Amino acid sequence: MASANTRRVGDGAGGAFQPYLDSLRQELQQRDPTLLSVAVAVLAVLLTLVFWKFIWSRKSSQRAVLFVGLCDSGKTLLFVRLLTGQYRDTQTSITDSSAIYKVNNNRGNSLTLIDLPGHESLRLQFLDRFKSSARAVVFVVDSATFQREVKDVAEFLYQVLIDSMALKNTPAFLVACNKQDIAMAKSAKLIQQQLEKELNTLRVTRSAAPSTLDSSSTAPAQLGKKGKEFEFSQLPLKVEFLECSAKGGRGDAGSADVQDLEKWLAKIA
């Protein structure tokens, strides 16, 4: 019965091509072994092109830019400024907001900006919902209160980066240091340095914690290079920093300082 089943399977679509493939292989081997090597090389190139076409088409379908951050980081106002250019009073939300954003480049591309809730009980839940469509992540930081919130910021950033490392599309990643119009705001360089220190501490703490994984579970991803002080450059995805201000330097009616953010969005679109 096994041989009969095998014959029936071979007589299908695959079996129809088998005699042709066998004769082609024999002919190539008889004529010149080098010819067979060339044929294999050409086939490898074709398979590589098909693979990259698949990756590119998948990347093209991912048009979402996720705005994440702690509550009161100013990400919702940043979201509104990019879309309308206007100031608007905002409040903490328990759901997401999304809109099409026309990027400022010669290609006329568009992105879908998605503002995710910053509340601690909701932010990871919404990140899970939208991460598969993410072309980019904008992690918004309140530069004015960063010094006292650095541990909370680093904790959330750690969770996002660990999750992003598991994503196959490795989204573009930006830390937007917002509220630069406030006198006590920390610079993007200082924020980067302090976050690297905090993330290094978190990494050591997490790795030293007792594991609760059973034999069927997957070990958590390692953030950065083992045995070295953590730096963002060690990650498989590129993390960039820039300074911005959603409110603007002249009060509510003032124009926002979001030009660098607009340029970054145009670059990754």
From Swiss-Prot:
Family label: Belongs to the SRP receptor beta subunit family.
Chain positions recorded as GTP binding sites: 69-77, 90-93, 118, 246
Keywords on record: Endoplasmic reticulum, GTP-binding, Membrane, Nucleotide-binding, Phosphoprotein, Receptor, Transmembrane, Transmembrane helix
InterPro entries: P-loop_NTPase, Small_GTPase_ARF, SRP_receptor_beta_su
Subcellular location: Endoplasmic reticulum membrane
GO biological-process terms attached to the record: protein targeting to ER
Described function: Component of the signal recognition particle (SRP) complex receptor (SR). Ensures, in conjunction with the SRP complex, the correct targeting of the nascent secretory proteins to the endoplasmic reticulum membrane system. May mediate the membrane association of SR.
GO cellular component, one term: signal recognition particle receptor complex
Main location: endoplasmic reticulum
Residues with Phosphothreonine modification: 212
GO molecular function: GTP binding; ubiquitin protein ligase binding
Modified residues (Phosphoserine): 110
Protein name as annotated: Signal recognition particle receptor subunit beta
Classification via Gene3D superfamilies: P-loop containing nucleotide triphosphate hydrolases (3.40.50.300)
Transmembrane segments: 35-55
Superkingdom as given in the UniProt entry: Eukaryota
Complex formation: Heterodimer with SRPRA.
Membrane topology: Single-pass membrane protein
One Pfam family matching this protein: SRPRB
Organism: Rattus norvegicus
